[in-house]
Amino acid sequence: MENKYVDLQENICSTFLQLFNTKMHWFKEMHPNDEKSIIDYTCTDRKDRKCHVELKQRLAKIDDYDTILLDATKLWAWTKIGYSDTLNDEQRLYFNFMNDGVIIYDINNQSEFKFYPRKKIWNPAEGKYEYRDKIGLPTKNAIIYRYNKDGTMTRVKNERYNKTYRD
């Protein structure tokens, strides 16, 4: 079933990923997964690793969050991919496009997961509140890029953000 809100969000996030990659050159190849896939993209990074990439747009600033919530079905989908594929060197990346930058989680290297069962959320695609299981990921364990006024991006380097995927 077609949902214009979902299609619009997918297009926006795809555009943000392409712009991010144009500036930062993380991926050599980027392929959107089909509509039935739970994970948005399959990419190949600069080290020739396969990356399973989930995208999310958030209408907020980076510093508004100390934890980003991930739908539990996404984490379970990544786990299923990990068990079904034979390659151990596959990356699971969660991109959050914010008003002032990008928060990226390397799921393979996350040690802190907080489970939020039956979290009440507004689903704009359905126009109603729903209860969903969520996984909390602390922003201190994320890779953070901030937008600069000249259109470039700068990797945040301070003690709040630990070493992860690209260091």
Language-model features: where?
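Intrinsically disordered, low-complexity terminal regions enriched in charged/polar residues
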Residues: 103-167
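Nucleic-acid nuclease catalytic cores
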Residues: 82-112
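Acidic-basic catalytic patches of nuclease active cores, encompassing PD-(D/E)XK
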Residues: 1-33
